[in-house]
Structures are given as structure tokens and as C-alpha cells.
């Protein structure tokens, strides 16, 4: 799998997880409708399925995915929550992405 496809798959996985967690948050914390739980469950099921599409050992996928999750969560903070990220939010998310790149794309011995 190419680096771009891997990154796009990680991004889709992160969005599915964040949506799946955000909707119950809206229901519980912001007096949203209980109907939000249905798309939340579907989104979390999609998240779990997307994790199976990554072509590496599960532990490596989970570790690398964490870096992308941090980056997407900061974008969510800005785009959905309406909170502008600080320079430290951006710096931390870029460091996390660098960690993901090392974990996923470093040369491996045979």
C-alpha cells in the first residue's frame, strides 16, 4: 500500500472514530437526541472495519494510528468545536504525525 493510500485510510479511520464518539457526547453532554446513538454505532463499526484494512501487524497499526488520530482531533477542535488550535496543539499534532510516519514507513528487515 502506498504512503498516500495509507495516510488516507488512517484519516478515514480517525474521522469514523471521532464521529462515533462525538455523537454520544452530544447526546449525553449537550442534550442531544438518543437517535444520535444509531449513527454513532454505525460509525464505530466502520472504524473497526477500517482498522482491518491496514496492511501491517495490528500493534503497529494501533500505534501509528494514534498519531493520525491526534492530528485529526486537533482539526476537529478547530472545525467542529470552533476552537482555534494553539501553536502547541499544532506542534504536538505534527510531532505525532512524524511518529506515525516513522512507525509506518521506516525500512523493515526481511
Swiss-Prot record:
It is found in: Cell inner membrane. The keyword Lipid metabolism does not apply. Signal peptide: none annotated. InterPro entries: UPF0060 (IPR003844). The chain crosses the membrane at residues 4-24, 33-53, 61-81, 87-107. It comes from the Bacteria. One of its GO terms (cellular component) is plasma membrane. Its main location: membrane. The keyword Transmembrane helix applies. Keywords: Cell inner membrane, Cell membrane, Membrane, Transmembrane, Transmembrane helix. Pfam families: UPF0060 (PF02694). It is a multi-pass membrane protein. Belongs to the UPF0060 family. This is UPF0060 membrane protein azo2656. It comes from Azoarcus sp. (strain BH72). The lineage of its organism: Bacteria, Pseudomonadati, Pseudomonadota, Betaproteobacteria, Rhodocyclales.
